[in-house]
């Protein structure tokens, strides 16, 4: 059997599981993933009445299965044995959920640990008010309609009541268009900025290097700024977690910000473990920017990242200034790390946002706190299609915003998913009406260190043109000051020229050499960076949002080669030689 066929069978194989009797009545030849069949509920019956009728008392396993069955299909839920057997079963599970009150969801936890209690505690005071009690009596279908009809200000009055499980449950009932309608009217801008506001869509520059080479990193920042991209954070994923190596990257990024007098306009972040960032901060006080941490949906899953609630609370208490905390999450991470705990990916993801909301409440109101949902990074064991990627992003945007968070997206795919470069463009266009706070930004769609596909500088420019999004006003003014954007708010003659930004940088450093000398040096720098396998964009195609045609062709050839290598079969004569 070829690898592609093997994985296809892995994704398709199922065992159907009947909720009433627990009897397996259909079996594949290879893999055994339970699927949930839901017998027809009674008229007006809610989840807990159904469970009582079927089991005689509350049954948490059945509860988890019903909530999982209410989800849109994803392979990750299927592997966990909590995916609906059919669209009809999914509809029945949603009918039961729709009749269930918010208060009943709040009182019946799918899984209890210190993290779920921390989330509950962050909403408890409001739940005990008269307004909170009134909200708790709403059925999920009524709550969904309220969200669809209410405006931003009205929705924000409801947020203090909402636990993470309630938020995940209402999202299960929504169509993609309903998710877009809600996401496009809830906004939590970062204090003192337009980032996260309606009509604005920012960028995290992701200047990664396969070798943590400082030249690779800073030139990607010059590159981003030459395309008027990069107003939220300069966020590097380091290869090494050595504190000295992390400190070098922190200082290089901080130097860029201070040289251009941007240290109060945007932040930087080196995405090492938060312990390492705190260690670096002891030596370089005030120069580490946003403190980053990957987070999970349960206490045990967070132990995989070597973090605890107490550790995160301790670090949150140390963030006294403007630049607070930055998290990354993604559906499926808990399950693929062995901590699914029997409940679905959507609730896991929502609980991550609940944790971050609770930590945000401990910071001062002027601190920047945001979260990046990395959707698609794990691969087809979580979900495999472009339609599922869109659904995941829309679900997570709404859940993040209902938690009161400024949330961005890493709309990404791995090489072993069934999502191509062109498919990724389609996904972006489906998601953009929901107005995420920000996206990733690289010279091309390919990350040279992480080896996955995400959004390029050109994608940002195309999105702005097509959807009318703007970037933070202060950075737009900076790009005009740097003569990247002209007085008419159009690309200038220097647009798409990272050497021009390098020239500006050196002039600010006091370099008195001629432009020709600096340009010659800059072009040599770009050549060195490219030789290390790190793309640097320069110029553009017919439109300013079109990638340079030569670079576009190069990336497509690399993508085709990578896909071919990934699925290439071992030659039969080589296999035979191993047995000789």
Model-derived features: where do they sit?
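C-terminal segment of N-terminal export signals and the immediately downstream linker at the start
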Residues: 1, 20-42
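N-terminal export signals
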Residues: 5-27
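Extended, intrinsically disordered, low-complexity segments
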Residues: 34-75, 108-129, 133-136, 140-168, ...
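N-terminal small/glycine-rich loop or linker at the start of catalytic domains
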Residues: 187-209, 329-338, 409
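Active-site mouth loops of central-metabolism enzymes
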Residues: 202-216, 414-420
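Glycine-rich, proline-tolerant flexible connector loops at the mouths of alpha/beta enzymes
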Residues: 233-250, 376-384
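Alpha-helix-loop-beta-strand connector modules within alpha/beta enzyme cores
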Residues: 246-270, 315-316, 390, 394-403, ...
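Catalytic alpha/beta core domains of metabolic enzymes, predominantly
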Residues: 281-428, 434, 440-442
């Amino acid at each position: 059997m070829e690898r592609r066929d093997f994985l296809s069978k892995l994704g398709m194989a199922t065992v159907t599981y009947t909720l009433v009797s627990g009897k397996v009545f259909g079996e594949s030849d290879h893999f055994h993933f339970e699927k949930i069949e839901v017998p027809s509920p009674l008229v007006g019956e809610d989840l807990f009445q159904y469970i009582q009728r079927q089991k005689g008392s509350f049954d948490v396993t059945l509860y988890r299965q019903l909530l999982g069955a209410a989800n849109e299909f994803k392979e990750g839920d299927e592997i966990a044995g909590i995916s609906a057997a059919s669209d009809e079963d999914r509809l029945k599970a949603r009918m039961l959920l729709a009749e269930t009150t918010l208060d009943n969801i709040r009182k019946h936890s799918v899984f209890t640990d210190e993290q779920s209690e921390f989330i509950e505690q962050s909403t408890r005071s409001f739940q005990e008010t008269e307004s909170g009690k009134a909200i708790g009596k709403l059925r999920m279908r009524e709550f969904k309609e309220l969200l669809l009809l209410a405006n931003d200000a009205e929705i924000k009055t409801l947020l203090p009541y909402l636990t993470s499980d309630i938020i995940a449950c209402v999202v299960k009932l929504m169509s993609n268009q309903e998710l877009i309608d809600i996401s496009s009217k809830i906004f939590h801008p970062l204090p003192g900025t337009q980032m996260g506001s309606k009509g604005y869509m920012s960028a995290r520059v992701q200047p990664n290097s396969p070798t943590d080479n400082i030249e690779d990193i800073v030139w990607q920042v010059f590159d981003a700024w030459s395309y008027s991209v990069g107003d939220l954070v300069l966020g590097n994923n380091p290869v090494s977690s050595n504190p000295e190596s992390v400190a070098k990257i922190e200082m290089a990024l901080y130097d860029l910000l201070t040289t251009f007098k941007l240290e109060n306009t945007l932040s930087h972040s080196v995405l090492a473990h938060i312990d390492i960032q705190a260690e670096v901060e002891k030596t370089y006080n005030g120069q580490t920017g946003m403190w980053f941490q990957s987070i999970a949906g349960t206490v045990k899953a967070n132990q995989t990242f070597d973090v605890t609630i107490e550790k995160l609370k301790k670090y949150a208490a140390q963030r006294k200034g403007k630049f607070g905390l930055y998290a990354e999450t993604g559906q499926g991470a808990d399950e693929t790390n062995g901590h699914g705990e029997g409940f679905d990916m959507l609730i896991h993801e929502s609980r991550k946002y609940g944790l971050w909301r609770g930590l945000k409440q401990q910071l001062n109101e002027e601190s920047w706190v945001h979260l990046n949902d990395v959707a698609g990074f794990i691969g087809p064991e979580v979900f495999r299609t472009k339609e599922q990627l869109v659904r995941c992003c829309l679900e997570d945007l709404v859940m993040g915003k209902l938690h009161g968070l400024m949330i961005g997206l890493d709309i990404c795919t791995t090489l072993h998913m069934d999502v191509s470069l062109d498919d990724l463009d389609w996904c972006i266009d489906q998601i953009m009406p929901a107005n995420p706070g920000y996206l990733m930004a690289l010279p091309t769609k390919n990350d040279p260190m992480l080896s996955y596909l995400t959004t390029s500088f050109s994608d940002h420019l195309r999105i702005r043109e097509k959807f009318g999004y703007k970037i933070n006003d202060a950075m737009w003014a900076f790009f005009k000051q740097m003569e990247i954007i002209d007085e008419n708010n159009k690309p200038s003659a220097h647009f798409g020229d990272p050497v021009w930004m390098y020239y500006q940088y050196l002039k600010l450093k006091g370099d008195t050499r001629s432009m020709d000398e600096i340009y010659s040096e800059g072009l040599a720098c770009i050549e060195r960076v490219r030789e290390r396998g790190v793309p640097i964009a320069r110029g553009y195609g017919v439109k300013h949002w079109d990638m340079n045609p030569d670079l576009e062709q190069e990336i497509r050839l690399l993508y085709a080669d990578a896909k071919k290598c990934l699925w290439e079969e071992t030659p039969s004569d080589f296999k035979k030689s191993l047995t000789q």
